[in-house]
Amino acid sequence: MTDKVQTTLLFLAIGEFSVGILGNAFIGLVNCMDWVKKRKIASIDLILTSLAISRICLLCVILLDCFMLVLYPDVYATGKQMRIIDFFWTLTNHLSIWFATCLSIYYFFKIANFFHPLFLWMKWRIDRVISWILLGCMVLSVFINLPATENLNADFRRCVKAKRKTNLTWSCRVTKAQHASTKLFLNLVTLLPFSVCLVSFFLLILSLWRHIRRMQLSATGCRDPSTEAHVRALKAVISFLFLFIAYYLSFLIATSSYFIPETELAVIFGEFIALIYPSSHSFILILGNNKLRRASLKVLWTVMSILKGRKFQQKQI
């Protein structure tokens, strides 16, 4: 029964992976084509492209981890494959979260309306410093992940290679507890960008509320371009927050799996939930971006035209 459940979850994970690759590859392709055409890239497109690339890598690592757990559990647990997968998963995970946070920060500074001197200074300079912020996120992720992942894998390898039968169970329990605590630490580090995103969300709500009040007092209505921009930004940020919470819960499931009998099943179930975040958020970003939305509608119209043309040819035959 467990094997059937694992296989079912694996096939569902493949479906989520395919959807996520489709959405993120579309974002990256549209922005890169626009970059080549105009020979420059807007700040928002740079953030979205970086986010899409990091999520494509994250999806590939998660799916590879699922395959290794189901098909080659012994090789995965004892070889350096686990070390490599854990490192790249943690790295791409942190990059994806930090880039999504950069997107929330960018929305906040470009759309919100406050009159504090520091806010106005940052609003004026955000386009100039966003590339450096993205680079800083990459460097920070590498420096956090390298030592933590090495400790994580060293603890687990000691558990796997333990050969003293009298102390084997106790040794594994201790090292697995250390392994889980290291993973928990890596997950807690992601609470920093989550908190930044949460602050941006509440400040955007405050800015929207103040803007609507001004519109009502001036009797000009509430559905002006600034209000629409606020609403679109809030939808993108709140979707990230909800999906990130589900993503974080999936890591807690995977971490707690070391203390329950069906470890592999719990890990695969956690990874199945984890795939929802990078897969679905890309389509929310596409719908919230005018250029990406127009490009997606154009692609859908082209596909529909091709399908209708084939049906017409088949009827003639």
From Swiss-Prot:
<keyword id="KW-0812">Transmembrane</keyword>
<keyword id="KW-0675">Receptor</keyword>
<feature type="transmembrane region" description="Helical; Name=6">
    <location>
        <begin position="236"/>
        <end position="256"/>
    </location>
</feature>
<feature type="topological domain" description="Extracellular">
    <location>
        <begin position="150"/>
        <end position="187"/>
    </location>
</feature>
<keyword id="KW-0297">G-protein coupled receptor</keyword>
<feature type="transmembrane region" description="Helical; Name=4">
    <location>
        <begin position="129"/>
        <end position="149"/>
    </location>
</feature>
<feature type="transmembrane region" description="Helical; Name=5">
    <location>
        <begin position="188"/>
        <end position="208"/>
    </location>
</feature>
<dbReference type="GO" id="GO:0004930">
    <property type="term" value="F:G protein-coupled receptor activity"/>
</dbReference>
<feature type="topological domain" description="Extracellular">
    <location>
        <begin position="257"/>
        <end position="266"/>
    </location>
</feature>
<feature type="topological domain" description="Cytoplasmic">
    <location>
        <begin position="31"/>
        <end position="55"/>
    </location>
</feature>
<feature type="glycosylation site" description="N-linked (GlcNAc...) asparagine">
    <location>
        <position position="167"/>
    </location>
</feature>
<feature type="topological domain" description="Extracellular">
    <location>
        <begin position="1"/>
        <end position="9"/>
    </location>
</feature>
<feature type="topological domain" description="Cytoplasmic">
    <location>
        <begin position="209"/>
        <end position="235"/>
    </location>
</feature>
<keyword id="KW-0325">Glycoprotein</keyword>
<comment type="similarity">
    <text>Belongs to the G-protein coupled receptor T2R family.</text>
</comment>
<keyword id="KW-0472">Membrane</keyword>
<dbReference type="InterPro" id="IPR007960">
    <property type="entry name" value="TAS2R"/>
</dbReference>
<feature type="transmembrane region" description="Helical; Name=7">
    <location>
        <begin position="267"/>
        <end position="287"/>
    </location>
</feature>
<keyword id="KW-0919">Taste</keyword>
<comment type="function">
    <text>Gustducin-coupled receptor implicated in the perception of bitter compounds in the oral cavity and the gastrointestinal tract. Signals through PLCB2 and the calcium-regulated cation channel TRPM5.</text>
</comment>
<feature type="topological domain" description="Cytoplasmic">
    <location>
        <begin position="116"/>
        <end position="128"/>
    </location>
</feature>
<feature type="transmembrane region" description="Helical; Name=1">
    <location>
        <begin position="10"/>
        <end position="30"/>
    </location>
</feature>
<dbReference type="InterPro" id="IPR017452">
    <property type="entry name" value="GPCR_Rhodpsn_7TM"/>
</dbReference>
<feature type="topological domain" description="Extracellular">
    <location>
        <begin position="77"/>
        <end position="94"/>
    </location>
</feature>
<keyword id="KW-0716">Sensory transduction</keyword>
<keyword id="KW-1133">Transmembrane helix</keyword>
<protein>
    <recommendedName>
        <fullName>Taste receptor type 2 member 7</fullName>
    </recommendedName>
</protein>
<dbReference type="GO" id="GO:0033038">
    <property type="term" value="F:bitter taste receptor activity"/>
</dbReference>
<feature type="transmembrane region" description="Helical; Name=2">
    <location>
        <begin position="56"/>
        <end position="76"/>
    </location>
</feature>
<dbReference type="Pfam" id="PF05296">
    <property type="entry name" value="TAS2R"/>
</dbReference>
<feature type="transmembrane region" description="Helical; Name=3">
    <location>
        <begin position="95"/>
        <end position="115"/>
    </location>
</feature>
<keyword id="KW-0807">Transducer</keyword>
<dbReference type="GO" id="GO:0005886">
    <property type="term" value="C:plasma membrane"/>
</dbReference>
<feature type="topological domain" description="Cytoplasmic">
    <location>
        <begin position="288"/>
        <end position="317"/>
    </location>
</feature>
